[in-house]
A protein has these predicted regions:
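Short glycine-rich donor-binding/catalytic loop of glycosyltransferases
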Residues: 56, 73, 77-84, 98-99
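A charged, aromatic-enriched C-terminal amphipathic alpha-helix characteristic of glycosyltransferases
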Residues: 116-148
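Short acidic alpha-helix that forms the nucleotide-activated donor recognition element
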Residues: 37-48, 70
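Short alpha-helical segment that forms part of, or immediately flanks, the ligand-binding pocket
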Residues: 42, 63-70, 84-85
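Conserved acidic donor-binding segment of nucleotide-sugar-dependent glycosyltransferases
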Residues: 89, 93-101, 111-116
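Glycosyltransferase donor-sugar binding loop
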Residues: 2-17
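Acidic donor-binding loop of glycosyltransferase active sites
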Residues: 46-60, 73
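Nucleotide-activated donor-binding/catalytic signature segment of Leloir-type glycosyltransferases, i.e.
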Residues: 17-37
Length: 156
């Protein structure tokens, strides 16, 4: 079993998440690691299958979320326009209302109940989504096409 890693950027909801962690560790259904600070996020993402982003002020593209998706992690986060764009449509139900701890815990519970095949499919879908939509090569080709079209129109 790959461990589940929850990254806490603030301590606001730490108590509820610790209680949630104890429930799963006691039943030994899975492993959930709560971490305040991670020295090497990339190494942690290679080992994990769930990445939780609890930063409510996330009105910019999060490189951490993109890295987590690219590493095949399911991303659970607060719902906002930016995060809806970062996550594949199939997984928008992993986005919860800001501060809605009950919904957050229900989402994590559902992910922890997934079998290995479902979890692997989720990871592959997330990875492919990032590679296809946030790839520098794809963006470069779109920019070249746009400039070519503009240059051609100007020349005519």
């Amino acid at each position: 079993i790959r461990p589940y890693i929850v990254v806490l950027k603030s301590n606001v909801n730490k108590k509820q998440l610790n209680e949630f962690e104890e429930k799963y560790l006691r039943n030994r259904n899975s492993v959930l690691c709560l971490m305040d600070n991670i020295a090497d996020l990339e190494a942690s993402l290679k080992l994990s299958s769930i990445y939780l982003e609890l930063n409510p002020q996330n009105h910019f593209y999060s490189l951490d979320i993109l890295n987590a998706l690219a590493m095949g992690n399911a991303v659970v986060s607060w719902e906002n326009d930016v995060n809806r764009e970062l996550l594949p449509k199939e997984y928008h139900n992993y986005l919860t209302g800001n501060g809605d701890i009950k919904r957050l815990i229900q989402t994590l519970t559902n992910l922890l109940k997934m079998n290995a095949q479902e979890r692997n499919f989720t990871g592959r879908t997330s990875r492919n989504y990032v590679l296809n939509n946030f790839n520098i090569k794809n963006m470069e080709e779109l920019l070249i096409d746009a400039y070519s079209t503009l240059s051609f129109r100007k020349a005519s």
